[in-house]
Amino acid sequence: FGVISDIDDTVISSHVTNKLKMILTVLLSNEHTRKPFEGVAGFYQALQRGAGGGEDNPIFYVSNSAWNLYSLLVEFLKLQKIPLGPLLLRDFGDHLLFSKEPEHHKKKNIKIILESFPHLPFVLIGDSGERDPEIYRDVVKEYPTRIRTVYIRSVNKQPTRLAAIDKLIEEIRPTGSQLVLAPDSEFAAAHAAA
């Protein structure tokens, strides 16, 4: 299987839902000062190795971060011992911070990956901060036999957001895939290992 993962607020704390905090984080931090969410490196290493431990499952990163952060993100992944893989980022421009449809970039690139590896099932990993659950639901519905599991890191604990994700869990269930709302990487890793 392959893995398609978001980066911001999934692998690394970026404060995407708070634009001011996000801008300050981008401007005032670097690959040495930014920190991954606890347990991310071990979880992604285990996914890459697979159940038997001897696989080399590919990991793709699809993010709405700008291409000018590419070097920082690659160095960050190396420093944190998070498996490397292709990073599909967005072009920088006026639309980047205030785009009404950031999901177009993600959905388009996820489809390209799925169509480039037509016989490979995938695990999708994202967060509840913005639109990852809805984007991944759409992907599961379009490719129902291709997505094994969707892991969503719970970063938005608002009751309305949690209720919306509960609804998405039920929408995905009939496809044979599942959406797992994970409080942390340890929970997701335990679920994946089961």
Predicted regions and their residues:
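Alpha-helical substrate-recognition element adjacent to the catalytic core
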Residues: F1-E103
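C-terminal cap/substrate-recognition subdomain and adjoining C-terminal extension
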Residues: S65-A194
